[in-house]
A protein has these predicted regions:
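Short, basic/aromatic beta-hairpin or loop at an interaction surface
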Residues: 108-129, 156-161
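Hydrophobic alpha-helical membrane-insertion segments, chiefly the h-region
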Residues: 15-24
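N-terminal Sec-pathway targeting helices
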Residues: 1-14
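Structural motif
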Residues: 145-146
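Aromatic- and glycine-rich peptidoglycan recognition patches
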Residues: 23, 27-38, 48, 59, ...
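N-terminal capping segments
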Residues: 27-112
Length: 195
C-alpha cells in the first residue's frame, strides 16, 4: 500500500513539474510575442534582400546542403559562391551560404570574399564578419538586418521576433521570416557597421 502511495505521489509531482514547464515556456513565448509585437517594421538593404532571396528559394524548391557535402535531398551537393550562380547552377543552400548571398546582394560582401574566406560555414562567416568590423550588440537592442550567431548556425533577424533562416530543408522551403527559436540561444548578435 505504501508503494502505491509513493508511486501516486511521484506521478503527481512529475505531472505538476510538466505542467509548470509548459506554463513557463508558454509564458516566455507570450512575453516574447508581446515584447516584439510593438517593434517597428524596419526595412533595410539586408532585410529586403533576405526576403527576396528566400522567396526565390521557396518558389524554386532549393535543397539544403552543407559545405562538407552532407545533403538531405537527392545526394548531389553543391553550393554556389553567389545567389546569381545558384539560379543556373546547384539549387542548394545552407545557413551560411544564404546569409553570405544576402550580404553580397546588399553590398556588404563580395564574391571573392566569399570564396577566399570559405564563407559556406557558419563559424567562418561569423569570424569574418567580426574581423570585418561588424559590431556585437545586446539582444535588447536587436534590429531587423542584424545577424544572429549560434554555435554552428547563422540567420538574419527579420524583426518582430522572427528570422530569415536556411538552416535545414524545412527552413529553406518555409515562408520567411519564421519565428525565432530563442531556445537555440544566440551566442552573439552582429550588426553591420553602417546600420
Amino acid at each position: 500500500m505504501k508503494k502505491i502511495r509513493v508511486i501516486i505521489i511521484a506521478s503527481l509531482l512529475l505531472i505538476a513539474i510538466a505542467i509548470a514547464v509548459v506554463c513557463v515556456t508558454r509564458k516566455t513565448t507570450l512575453l516574447d510575442d508581446m515584447l516584439y509585437a510593438n517593434e517597428p517594421d524596419i526595412e533595410n538593404s539586408i532585410t529586403i534582400k533576405a526576403k527576396e532571396i528566400h522567396t526565390y528559394m521557396e518558389e524554386n524548391h532549393y535543397g539544403y546542403c552543407t559545405y562538407d557535402n552532407r545533403c538531405n535531398h537527392d545526394g548531389n551537393c553543391g553550393l554556389n559562391a553567389t545567389f546569381e550562380l545558384s539560379k543556373t547552377g546547384y539549387h542548394n543552400t545552407c545557413c551560411a551560404t544564404y546569409v553570405s548571398w544576402v550580404l553580397q546582394e546588399a553590398g556588404y560582401l563580395t564574391k571573392q570574399e566569399h570564396i577566399d574566406n570559405y564563407l559556406n560555414g557558419a563559424n567562418n562567416l561569423i569570424r569574418y564578419l567580426t574581423k570585418k568590423g561588424w559590431k556585437e550588440i545586446n539582444k535588447k537592442d536587436i534590429q531587423p538586418g542584424d545577424i544572429l550567431c549560434y554555435n554552428g548556425h547563422i540567420a538574419i533577424y527579420g524583426g518582430r521576433g522572427r528570422q530569415y533562416d536556411a538552416g535545414s530543408k524545412e527552413y529553406v522551403n518555409k515562408e520567411a521570416p519564421c519565428k525565432i527559436s530563442w531556445g537555440m540561444n544566440t551566442e552573439k548578435i552582429l550588426r553591420a557597421p553602417d546600420l
